[in-house]
Amino acid sequence: MKIVLTGATGMIGSVLTERLSKSHNSLVLLSRRPPAGNHAAKRQWLAWQPGVSGEWERAIDGADAVINLAGEPIAGKRWTAKQKEILRSSRVDGTKALVHAIAKAKVKPKLMISSSAVGYYGPHGDEALNEDSKPGDDFLARLCVDWETEAHKAEAFGVRVCLLRTGIVLAKGEGALKKMVPPFKMFTGGPLGSGRQWMPWIHLDD
């Protein structure tokens, strides 16, 4: 299979790249800053700037699947107005650019897997939720709604769209745990808030 992947340098994308490479897959990895000198077999790195035409658009033509994991880290910086715009544009504009490239492709991918998050639902306390539950109305919820809306537009071109509403992704020494574990190692850790609030999570292996 020929798979086009965005977000390949992120925590999820880097692991997925390694696992897909072990199968008989040809990978095209899109990045704003492709690593220099990375010429591993079955992998092709291409510079990707949403809204700017380039070789990356032609790579989508004839691909079997597009996996869209790109997005500025949610917890990387304080949510100033500027940072919120970066969070939004890295997700919504990036997805819009991919769908635009799919629309132009002569041979369109059969599948597009696009990231989202459980932030889609907003805070609900103890209420059980599923994929049919209504979205929330805070910043993260509105961001996820707009993000998913752009991905769904690929369906107009006969592409099956799957959305991944993941929780906090946990992995040893990476992501959220990388920031949460050190205080406990220094015996200064403790519960966050009341310690009774819900925190949906998923392990990186899953």
Located regions from the model:
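N-terminal Rossmann NAD(P)H-binding glycine-rich loop of SDR-like oxidoreductase domains
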Residues: 3-23
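SDR active-site strand-loop-helix element
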Residues: 6, 30, 69-70, 112-118, ...
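N-terminal Rossmann-fold cofactor-binding loop
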Residues: 30-34, 49-50
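NAD(P)H-binding glycine-rich loop region in Rossmannoid oxidoreductase-like domains
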Residues: 43-94
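Conserved Rossmann-fold NAD(P)-dependent oxidoreductase catalytic core, especially the SDR/UDP-sugar
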Residues: 84, 96-138
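Catalytic helix-loop patch of NAD(P)-dependent Rossmann-fold dehydrogenases
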Residues: 89, 93, 125-163
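NAD(P)-dependent short-chain dehydrogenase/reductase
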Residues: 141, 154-157, 162-163, 167-200
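A conserved structural motif in NAD(P)-dependent oxidoreductases
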Residues: 200-206
